[in-house]
Amino acid sequence: MAEVPELASEMMAYYSSNEDDLFFEVDGPKQMKCSFQDLDLCPLDGGIQLQISHEHYNKGFRQAVSVVVAMEKLRKMLVPCPQTFQDNDLSTLIPFIFEEEPVFLDTCNNDACVHDAPVRSLHCTLRDAQLKSLVMSGPYELKALHLQGQDVEQQVVFSMSFVQGEESNDKVPVALGLKAKNLYLSCVLKDDKPTLQLESVDPKNYPKKKMEKRFVFNKIEINNKLECESAQFPNWYISTSQAENMPVFLGGTRGGQDITDFTMQFVSS
């Protein structure tokens, strides 16, 4: 079997005469001017540099060829070293790391958002300008009459909730529910006339910030007096009669025979 000859003058011809520049390229002998002391990966188009050690000149030609072949394969695999990483380089990497997907904002409609808003409420009693108190008369009716002594406990305690409505400097939208009862004052049209009634509601859904308009009253305070105007029927007010023990109703006149002025007394919860 033929033996591969030792590398001698053929290989030495590739070497530089400068001991500090002992390099050669796979593409052929060439004297290199760069120092191998600061070695980095080179660009693909810059060739491959090898350092030849003085202590290994006697290596066989077979080993030298193996090194050249191995380095030639590596040259096809190596990638150029990037420059110093900058902040703006991140923007070019992000599209490869993250997959962009559209984000759809699930906005709720105004009604749903308002329904979830907390409702501020207070407890109070109402008496008309003649100091008549409001009491229950039957399951769905209020009457106004004078109460004395222990009878005062019969007066209705309202849960006044501050709700959404056409608020202004002198008008505050409220809803008037009966404390500890599932009843609210509401204004509806009966026989073509605005009418005040007590309406039963589901306690799971009431009170809420956006009440139906029939439940809303514009609270108007003037000189420590209180008026409650229907939001459903403007210029119609919660009213009482001059007579004793008469139903509370919705009246269309102010300052006349019907009483529309009330005083409000707060009640602790």
From Swiss-Prot:
Its main location: cytoplasm. Keywords: Cytokine, Cytoplasm, Inflammatory response, Lysosome, Mitogen, Pyrogen, Secreted. One of its GO terms (molecular function) is interleukin-1 receptor binding. It is found in: Cytoplasm, Cytosol; Secreted; Lysosome; Secreted, Extracellular exosome. Pfam families: IL1 (PF00340), IL1_propep (PF02394). The keyword Cytoplasm applies. Monomer. In its precursor form, weakly interacts with full-length MEFV; the mature cytokine does not interact at all. Interacts with integrins ITGAV:ITGBV and ITGA5:ITGB1; integrin-binding is required for IL1B signaling. Interacts with cargo receptor TMED10; the interaction is direct and is required for the secretion of IL1B mature form. Interacts with HSP90AB1; the interaction facilitates cargo translocation into the ERGIC. Interacts with HSP90B1; the interaction facilitates cargo translocation into the ERGIC. IL1B production occurs in 2 steps, each being controlled by different stimuli. First, inflammatory signals, such as LPS, stimulate the synthesis and promote the accumulation of cytosolic stores of pro-IL1B (priming). Then additional signals are required for inflammasome assembly, leading to CASP1 activation, pro-IL1B processing and eventually secretion of the active cytokine. IL1B processing and secretion are temporarily associated. Potent pro-inflammatory cytokine. Initially discovered as the major endogenous pyrogen, induces prostaglandin synthesis, neutrophil influx and activation, T-cell activation and cytokine production, B-cell activation and antibody production, and fibroblast proliferation and collagen production. Promotes Th17 differentiation of T-cells. Synergizes with IL12/interleukin-12 to induce IFNG synthesis from T-helper 1 (Th1) cells. Plays a role in angiogenesis by inducing VEGF production synergistically with TNF and IL6. Belongs to the IL-1 family. This is Interleukin-1 beta.
